C-alpha cells in the first residue's frame, strides 16, 4: 500500500451575479470546505474461516472511533480533525487477504499536536500557518482580560470559563 494523497482544502466563496457584468464576483467566506482523505487498507486473516469476522472486527474499531485525530507517521507533530468515517466494500484478494478503503472526512486545516495541549495563560504560542480557532479554558475567580490577535475580551470569571473560537 502507498501513502494516501491529501487534497488541498478549497476556500468557500459567496458567488455574486451582477446584471450587465461579465462573469461573477466572489467574496471569500473565510472558511474552508471539508476534505476527504481516502486510505486503502489490507488485512491478513490467520484462518480463511475467520476472514469475514476479522473484517467485522476491523469495521467495529473504525466506527467506534468515528471522530478524532488522523495522523501520519511521516508527518509527525500534525493531525487532521476527523468528522466522519465511511468504510468501503471489503474485497477478497485471496482466501486470507482482504482489502478495503476508508474515507475520512476531515476539517480543511491541519493542526499541531502541540497546539492541542493545555497551556498556562502566560504562555504564548506563535502559529506561522493558517488562522487558528483555539479553545480557551480559564479557571479562577475575578476579572480576566484575554487578548488574541489584537482583539481584547474582558470577562468576570466565577470558577471556569470556556471560550471556543471554532463555534
Residue map of PLM features:
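Solvent-exposed edge beta-strands and adjacent loop segments
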Residues: 1-36, 76-90
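Oligomerization/assembly interface segments of phage tail-like spikes and tubes
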Residues: 24-49, 96-109
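Generic structural detector for well-ordered beta-strands
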Residues: 42, 71, 103-105, 137, ...
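Short, surface-exposed beta-strand/loop "edge" segments at domain boundaries and coil↔beta transitions
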Residues: 47-49, 77-81, 143-146
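Short amphipathic alpha-helices in soluble, non-transmembrane regions
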Residues: 53-63
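Short beta-strand and beta-hairpin "edge-sheet" elements
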Residues: 64-110, 114-115
